[in-house]
Amino acid sequence: MLNAVGIDVAKRKSTITIRRPGDEIVLPPCDVHHNQTEINELISYIKSLKGETKVCMEHTGRYYEPMAYWLSNAGIFVSAVNPILIKDFKDDDSFRAPKTDKADAAKIARYTLDRWSKLKQYGLMDEIRNQLKTMNRQFGFYMDQKTAMKNNLISLLD
């Protein structure tokens, strides 16, 4: 039995739904706030599901990182997907798709079922890559500040 957990991540809360093949709804869309109690309840619920479970979320900004980290450390398969792939995923024939957190979570869950075997697991390398990107950004900022200070000193000495 396959369980696809679709998570639409936001700053302080995430909208979550769980679906199975045949569009069977295990958990209708609901909000989970980013606090330890609710995250632990979610982890317990996901682990209690029968069959194989995969969690999928969009990696928008940095909001997804804590949720991906918590779930991954709990031993749950997590995949963070480029939002463009989710946006371009055509899962129904409707011309006008709703744009709400609940609809997004459901679309992510359907995407998870459709791409089940192709999902890449979130892991340590993703965290290291993010840390390196942050350090590189900080180094660039430092070098810009250093150059500005040198130019300022030169103009003061002239």
Regions found by a protein language model. Give the residues of each.
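Short glycine-rich phosphate-binding loop at a beta-alpha junction
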Residues: 53-63
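Anion (oxyanion) recognition and catalysis
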Residues: 72
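Residue-level detector of anion-binding/catalytic polar loops
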Residues: 77
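Gly/Thr-rich phosphate-binding beta-strand-loop-beta motif of the actin/hexokinase/Hsp70
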Residues: 1-20, 108
